[in-house]
């Protein structure tokens, strides 16, 4: 199944209609919702189901103007790199030989190499993190994870922090690889994320399979 077919399937479900009604009501109230509507499904558009090598699961989008473009942990060109992404870059610099920390926080080049940068909740209101939780997006993205689990094999899931760890129950660990650590947030990065070597492990696994390595 393609992501287009998957999304069409979800659109016919009751939970999705309720979710869209909620989003419509918020827009009618004049709320600023991020990311912009055309980027809500950016992760799915940039990383087709059949191309997925890695899934990096986030929680919900950045909630400040201009930050969110539909990819977990990523920000568009010209936007200040957020603290969690700074720690991701820090970990990359210690685990990937020759890695130079970029000036941009745009991870679209990861997405185009088969890394699905998926938030569990796909929209947020300006300056109100988590406000679109439990409105239906979790069902949508859980169903997407289940689709990956069923349709593919050998996908590497990077689950950072307790929220992401719970999604591990949707993944068949006999078919896929699950790597876990604490969240890269400054609050928890030093309790296990920094030093986790997930990025080098991903390339080691891909090398063993004689697959194209990720250019981080």
Curated annotation (Swiss-Prot):
GO terms for molecular function: uracil DNA N-glycosylase activity. CDD domains: UDG-F1-like (cd10027). Keywords: Cytoplasm, DNA damage, DNA repair, Hydrolase. This is Uracil-DNA glycosylase. It comes from the Bacteria. It catalyses: Hydrolyzes single-stranded DNA or mismatched double-stranded DNA and polynucleotides, releasing free uracil. GO terms for biological process: base-excision repair, AP site formation via deaminated base removal. Excises uracil residues from the DNA which can arise as a result of misincorporation of dUMP residues by DNA polymerase or due to deamination of cytosine. Its main location: cytoplasm. The active site is at residue 60. The gene is ung. It holds the Pfam family UDG. It comes from Psychromonas ingrahamii (strain DSM 17664 / CCUG 51855 / 37). One of its GO terms (cellular component) is cytoplasm. It is found in: Cytoplasm. Its EC number is 3.2.2.27. SUPFAM superfamilies: Uracil-DNA glycosylase-like (SSF52141). Belongs to the uracil-DNA glycosylase (UDG) superfamily. UNG family.
